[in-house]
Design a protein with these regions (language model features):
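C-terminal non-catalytic interaction modules
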Residues: 1-13, 17, 186-276
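Structural register within alpha-helical repeat arrays
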Residues: 17, 52, 57-59, 98, ...
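Structural motif corresponding to the intra-repeat A-B loop/turn of tetratricopeptide repeats
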Residues: 24, 64-66, 105, 143, ...
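Residue register of alpha-helical TPR repeats
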Residues: 12, 51-54, 93, 131-133, ...
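Structural signature of alpha-solenoid helical repeat junctions
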Residues: 9, 46-51, 86, 90, ...
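Amphipathic alpha-helical segments of tetratricopeptide repeats
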Residues: 35-42, 75-83, 116-123, 154-162, ...
């Protein structure tokens, strides 16, 4: 919306103030403040369709409007921004919000349809694409459709890595690994092959493809130095995944390192496995 603060209009500057207040949780009189911005964005003197769409989206998400109108309002924002600035970060954010609303309303398939409109080839920024793929993967898990879930986790991880979003990449990798360890096969296609050869399927056709051990090893080798910086904590399911990977791949090094540092581990379940 604003290339630089020096080019911003007074309305756009106030819009940035609204965004900062929301991010900081400073919501006192936020309904009145946002309504003022909305009215200004529609006025003859300060008309700004981008600001109008952003304010309407924020007001819907904050529950300022009638709850029965939230979905309609978010859809309006998507359509307006598609016409104004398709493929931008703001358009992608609007799509993400609409997809999340559908999911929270129990409409998983509709959410996936919206997520499918967030694409790098349409211009959407990589971070938005990554967040979309991560959320879509989680929806596929709830539908027990695990092949596309694994592909979307992998795609999300790649987007996050290219955008240097290390925390998000860690999350996507762990969620992928949790699925991958269900079945590992030397004859299974690797993830790059699965992404390259993915094809449309019949709706509701759940699928499962085992993971390739090379992919599992790649992920664990990425995760291991990060997860083992600090082994404390009484609920370390992430370390449990490392141990499972070590056993399944019959690659003892990871487990041996954990045994050497067993005094640092607090999770009783992890301790039981390492001491057995």
């Amino acid at each position: 919306m604003v290339d630089s603060i020096g080019d911003a209009t007074p309305l756009q500057i106030d819009m940035l103030i609204l965004q900062k207040r929301i991010s900081q949780g400073n919501l006192e009189n936020i309904a009145e403040f946002s309504e003022g911005l909305l009215n200004r964005s529609r006025s003859t003197g300060e008309r700004d369709h981008h600001v109008e769409a952003r304010v309407r989206m924020d007001r819907a998400l904050m529950g300022i409007i009638d709850a029965n109108l939230v979905g309609t309002e978010l859809k309006w924002c998507v359509d307006r921004l598609n016409a104004l600035c398709s493929g931008t970060a703001l358009h992608g954010l609007a799509l993400l919000n609409l997809a999340n609303w559908h999911r929270n309303s129990g409409e998983s398939i509709m959410s996936l349809i919206v997520h499918a409109d967030i694409r790098k080839d349409l211009g959407h920024p990589e971070d938005i694409v990554g967040l979309s793929r991560l959320e879509a993967a989680r929806i596929y898990v709830t539908l027990n459709d695990l092949d596309p879930a694994m592909r979307h986790f992998w795609s999300a991880r790649q987007s996050f890595q290219r955008n240097k979003m290390s925390s998000e990449s860690l999350v996507a990798s762990l969620e992928w690994l949790d699925l991958a360890l269900e079945e590992v096969s030397d004859s299974a296609p690797d993830m790059e092959n699965r992404l390259a050869n993915a094809a449309p399927r019949e709706t509701g056709e759940a699928t499962w493809i085992p993971s390739n051990p090379k992919d599992v090893k790649l992920i664990v080798e990425e995760l291991f130095p990060i997860l083992t910086r600090d082994l404390s904590g009484e609920n370390r399911n992430d370390i449990g995944l490392i141990i499972d990977s070590s056993d399944i791949l019959q690659f003892s090094l990871w487990k041996e390192i954990l045994v050497e540092r067993i005094d640092e581990i607090q999770d009783p379940n992890v301790l039981d496995v390492l001491q057995s």
